[in-house]
Amino acid sequence: MQYQSTRDKNLKASSAQAILNGLAPDGGLYTMPSFDEVKFDYTTVLNMDTMSMSTKILSKLLPDFSEAEMAKLVHDGYTGKFETDHLTPTVPVGEDFILELFRGPTSAFKDVALSMLPRLMTASKEKLGVDDEIMILTATSGDTGKAAMEGFCDVPGT
C-alpha cells in the first residue's frame, strides 16, 4: 500500500518514507487512499492487551513493518514509560467511562504518539538505508515540545 498526499494523490510514499518525510513535497499530509485497503477485523483486538492491540493495528496501517518488527517497536516505545501497562486505561465513572490520556512521562496525551515516533523513524531509516541521524527541533509554549523531547530521549540514531 502506498500513502498519498492530501494535495496531490499522484505523490505517493511507502509507510516508511511517509514516516521519515513527515509531509509530502507539496506540503500535504500522507494518508491512505482508502481505509478499504486495510482489511481488519476489529473484533480480533477487543480482548487483547494494549501492547498486542497496538502491534496488530500499527502493523496493518504501516505495511512496511512485519508484525514481529512492530511488536519490538511497540515494546521499546512503551514499556516502562507509562504509569500502567494499559498505557491509557479506561476507567468507570458512574455509568460512563473515561479514557485516561495522562499516564505518560509528561502527563500529556501526546506521549502516546511521541513515545512511538522515534522508534518508527529509526526503523524507517534502517529500512530505507538512510545513514543520517534524526534531529528534532522543538519550539513550543505548550506540552508538545516536552513530550517530543521525552519521546526521543536516549533513542539511538536520534
Task: Locate each region found by the language model.
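PLP-dependent amino-acid enzyme catalytic core
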Residues: 1-158
